[in-house]
Amino acid sequence: MAIKRGADLIVEALEEYGTEQVVGFIGHTSHFVADAFSKSHLGKRVINPATELGGAWMVNGYNYVKDRSAAVGAWHCVGNLLLHAAMQEARTGRIPAVHIGLNSDGRLAGRSEAAQQVPWQSFTPIARSTQRVERLDKVGEAIHEAFRVAEGHPAGPAYVDIPFDLTADQIDDKALVPRGATRAKSVLHAPNEDVREAAAQLVAAKNPVILAGGGVARSGGSEALLKLAEMVGVPVVTTSTGAGVFPETHALAMGSAGFCGWKSANDMMAAADFVLVLGSRLSDWGIAQGYITKMPKFVHVDTDPAVLGTFYFPLLSVVADAKTFMEQLIEVLPGTSGFKAVRYQERENFRQATEFRAAWDGWVREQESGDGMPASMFRAMAEVRKVQRPEDIIVTDIGNHTLPMFGGAILQRPRRLVTSMAEGILGCGFPMALGAQLAEPNSRVFLGTGDGALYYHFNEFRVAVEHKLPVITMVFTNESYGANWTLMNHQFGQNNWTEFMNPDWVGIAKAFGAYGESVRETGDIAGALQRAIDSGKPALIEIPVSKTQGLASDPVGGVGPNLLLKGREIPVDTGGSMYPGENLLHLKS
């Protein structure tokens, strides 16, 4: 037996669940926890970000790459109020993340406007689990529950609120931290009749497509996906979170779909007469449901029953693990009526797939070919590909540049493309890139960001330099929120709220001790990238670009000006209405 502080129990519980990285912010409520970390093996694995929001994005970047809550946040009371945006991304993007919120003295709870009492209930709509710990002997149990929920299905954020007086209190530690708990393995088998029905639909379709989402990556299903696609000769489209689960150099790879996706993928989805959806929420980022995609008949497979049939109505809904379902499918396909064991290159739909992919590849090459300035962002990505290795990670922020970053990256592995995939939150890129670099120190991390996005978190260059995180940041500058500049001009003939002045980005990077360089000729991009790599430092490369290239102008994702919402004519309610929303019945398209 030993007498231990609550802070020590918190650290021991995090160690028990395999925490690799701690991102924490100091304040009076986190003093005891900071001291406890310094005395543990995690003391050398603590990052103190410039802001709590930047730190929460680092946690997301780390855990997205690792596919578990390997990084944990520990935050000083009022700083917790900055976490919500990153936690919302973790929820809808299915990123496992445990956050420890250290609140003010618990004896003040419930008093009218007590100083610095964080309303922990504000996390309830966002986190998949929100707990308030009010007894010291419950600390370990609460953290155990947080990991169980965060790494479950669906994955997401879990928040544990602990009053800081408990971190200073002492108690006999016997049996207070659950020991030997194992993570549940999600191996959900589908009913045999559902597997046979899916196999029959796949074989009978003239132009089938497999849509592979992030659930395929999380299940470790890349090998099964490759075997299934080649066995049936079915082209593979991925969602944004599924990018890389199928090697994008393969002849059956159509790339990622959606409004930031590849045109070959969107064309393939539009031409399909049947889609096998594996491990996807069917969200806007995954397939651009709000803009372009009308689904044919499809079978929807996911571990989360809550996402089945919520937007589209599938022919068959299956609650199953993506990898397990594919393995079941591979087993029954040879006995399915109409199945032919022939090379995928000989199947009828292969020619159409190659035509779509060739057209897309040709278009991308055209975008990469120009030598003029402002530079093409596709050209920048072409130069990145020359130095990119299979293990390297591409991170993009949100804006016009997102399309060239998605379209220019050719991935061989899952979880190599990182951004705010679920919510599209501006400013996520730089801290997520730092988190990804922390998670995989032997990988190169290339970030593409707009100047507007970089304004959010450029202060985290301190973390990059202090911890020797050699992220290579390409900041595409045009002194505007380019996507909105284009759309505002298209719709209203003016660009209010979209332009701003830039600082000396290269000078700022150098002031922090990072490498910095400004590109003034397109032909200099390759050399700048190599010099950044050779420096071994965090690096910033400024690349001037136009305001119009990318998401809002190029229709390859089926979007472009289609992002604009046409107003509807709503009749005036002159007599009043007894029922809220009554006039919605009379809306005109």
Swiss-Prot record:
Binding positions for Mg(2+) per the UniProt entry: 451, 478
GO MF assignments: acetolactate synthase activity; flavin adenine dinucleotide binding; hydrolase activity; magnesium ion binding; thiamine pyrophosphate binding
Residues annotated to bind thiamine diphosphate: 52
Pfam families associated with the record: TPP_enzyme_C, TPP_enzyme_M, TPP_enzyme_N
Keyword Mitochondrion carried by entry: no
Residue ranges of the region described as Thiamine pyrophosphate binding: 400-480
Enzyme class of the recorded protein, top EC level: hydrolase
Keywords: FAD, Flavoprotein, Hydrolase, Magnesium, Metal-binding, Thiamine pyrophosphate
Gene Ontology terms: biological process: isoleucine biosynthetic process; L-valine biosynthetic process
Alphabetical list of SUPFAM superfamilies matching this protein: DHS-like NAD/FAD-binding domain (SSF52467), Thiamin diphosphate-binding fold (THDP-binding) (SSF52518)
The protein's role, per its UniProt record: Catalyzes the ring-opening cleavage of the alicyclic alcohol cyclohexane-1,2-dione.
Family of this protein: Belongs to the TPP enzyme family.
Protein name: Cyclohexane-1,2-dione hydrolase
Species of the source: Azoarcus sp
Taxonomy of the source species: Bacteria, Pseudomonadati, Pseudomonadota, Betaproteobacteria, Rhodocyclales
